[in-house]
Amino acid sequence: MDNKRYGHFDDQHREYVITDPKTPWPWINYLGNEDFFSLISNTAGGYSFYKDAKFRRITRYRYNNVPMDNGGRYFYINDNGCVWNPGWKPCKTPLDFYECRHGMSYTRITGCKNGVEASVLFFVPLKTLAEVQKLTLKNTTGEVKKLKLFSFEEWCLWNAATDMENFQRNFSTGEVEIEGSTIYHKTEYRERRNHYAFYHVNTEIQGYDTDRETFIGLYNEFANPDAVMEGKPRNSHAHGWSPIASHYIEVELKPGEEKDFIFLLGYVENEQDKKFVAPKVINKEKAYAIIEKLNTTEKVDKAFAELCQYWDALLNIYNVRTGNDKLDRMVNIWNQYQCMVTFNFSRSASFFESGVGRGMGFRDSNQDLVGFVHQIPPRARQRIIDIASTQFPDGGCYHQYQPLTKRGNNDIGGGFNDDPCWLIFGTVAYIKETGDFSILDEMVPFDNQPGSEVTLFEHLKISMDHVIKNLGPHMLPLIGRADWNDCLNLNCFSWDPNESFQTTENVSEGTKAESLMIAGLFVVTGKDYVALCNKIEELKNGKIENFNSSTLKSFNFSTEAARMQQAVDAMIDAVKKHGWDGEWYLRAYDFYGRKIGSNECDEAKIFIESQGWCTMAEIGAEDGMVAKSLDSCKKYLECEHGMVLNNPAFSKYIYEYGEISSYPEGYKENAGIFCHNNPWVIIGECLAGRGNDAWSHYAKILPSYVEEKYQTLHKVEPYVNCQMVAGKDAFRPGEGKNSWLTGTAAWMWYTVSEFILGIKPDYDGIRIDPCLPETASDYTVSRKFREAEYEITIHPNGAQKGIKQIVLDGKAIDGAIIPYSAGKHVVEVTM
């Protein structure tokens, strides 16, 4: 397949530049950093929402539509009968020039046609509940241009799920108000809702439309709205049906003249007793304040500069210079940016996730923390509290929670037995980054129930105990509904296509099927828990000022560390005895006690998840198990585009295994390349000192390398990781799916920053422990850590692993940890 190119990286401006609107799939970006968010494609498709893409959807979007990516924030330009859009869609009029620049929380789309240049800057200003759309029109001809400009947004009726189904109600609820150049969407505001949205432009308008059928025409499309094609607004007022917001502006441009138009899509919540200023007239005071804040080009430019400065600061916390542009751009820009997005959205809203079916995942959000905690630690801290608040008293937890309410999702429930361990993983990462042990003293409820509060540390303790209390016949962890692999449903037994694999239970009640993946995870997080307990005991004597809880002050952390170490040792013994297949670790035992992921199996003889976690746990390393497992990954799982999840693929549905065997060969969990778990094996390679293999695996799924070789085949955005790449058994190996919202982002960051480049936050400072390919050159990492700034230069000298000497501020130090102290420091590391 020819590798047609649709764009390129612009590292200086931290942008990806798309030069052809007809990308193989919509290539999107995310706007907003907190509360107000938007998804925007390279042709301005997408939608906006407040906090929760399900319950506070502001604008409408139709997934899997024909044509693809139809609907968004559109500007129609009628130039003497020639109608076009700056982003090509929806009219798809051929443009003389097109460019989309996706940057850090902003997108700029530029189109030119017949001597008119239209450029739109889209962004959400910091701490503002509005999306700015700054449209600049420029006349590049020697003649006067008279243009008819139409804006367009289609309102969603708030709940994105019922918006797509409850039409017997929806067609009768839509309400709007029009005041000057602002169109207000107030559907259902009269009753239980206290929120509305608005669409404003900072100039006088010559007309408007708020009824979709009137504006477009019942049998027309976004590509040919009646009002636009005829150049005449209808001044329609929506009463039910489908409300929209469209401004009509007559624009005259002299030769060489350009004009700015500031459009604002905003969201407002009012206090219950301040909803109206007169009967049926909404209180617009907060909307006026947003408009006043952003009603001129100068104000918008200032807000945009502040956003850019915000990202400058975030991306200067960790910066590497290796001389390898492909590596540097991913580490310094796009990987960290994607980590922010996954932290904000978990797996809820992308062009593959509709924002309706999933909220914030317990497992997902804890993993996302390791890619984000260095950027904004206070937000990471609050996220940990929110996650722990959805835990149950027995240590189990809701699998997901809604971002708007922060309450557990009853539709999914719990019973995914890996979930509790991830709370230790996320919390330890936070404390190592910040040194803030006081988080362990926070009083956190169970299931968000008032009066049930215990310290966060007690939540960690019962998380570990949940695994210990749920062991199977081989003393390995029970899998429950599933472990990390939501599609390995060993207690489901479903023949009914109308039921969910994840939520269907059979009579076994999950008391037999066991997971080697959870076993490895338990050992890794158990070691972290033991080290945390020992560190607390070391610091307890007056050195942790904020430990106010009598429970924690009187708790014997040394005894707890010893207790948990025994449990970890027992798990290691169980894995060695019952989890080793000769060349690799087993994946699981099914309900009947049969091996899964064994050479004895007809298909799916080896799985990546247990190889990753058991090698990360270094189980049996002294007996050669880790090395054999890693060799088996390379021999049986690796292919041109990464490592597949299992091999060979399932060729038929096996009801004892569940959803995993329902996929065609090479896709998703059935031998697809799940990019999320490739880093687990890479970390195992790093811990084993195998830098050449670690780098080889890493580069295969690094977007900048994929972009260079497989831009057309890969299909999805070339600047971020995707969840899944079609495996070697697929019809089209190398094709990507499920981009953006994937744990791959955090794991790629964690892997490269801490294990390959080797800069690891620790309780007492920064641990230096790189694992590099033999070809690696000298490199420098600038790392802000708490109140310190470190300039760390690594001299590999051809070594893959091992430190000969560390020189801190001109003096050699013992050990591999740079002791923390505030201020600026220069570090030289010789391998």
Features from the language model and the residues they span:
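Active-site lining segments that contact anionic ligands and/or coordinate catalytic metals
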Residues: 104-106, 244-248, 258, 609-611, ...
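Beta-rich accessory regions
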Residues: 126-150, 193-198, 202-212, 254-260, ...
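Catalytic cores of carbohydrate-active enzymes
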Residues: 150-152, 167, 398-400, 521-548, ...
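Active-site acid/base region of carbohydrate-active enzymes
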Residues: 319-333, 378, 382, 387-396, ...
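Conserved hydrophobic/aromatic pocket- or pore-lining residues that grip, position, or stack substrates
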Residues: 334, 368, 614
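Solvent-exposed loop and edge beta-strand segments that line ligand/cofactor-binding
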Residues: 350-365, 408-417, 501-519, 594-617, ...
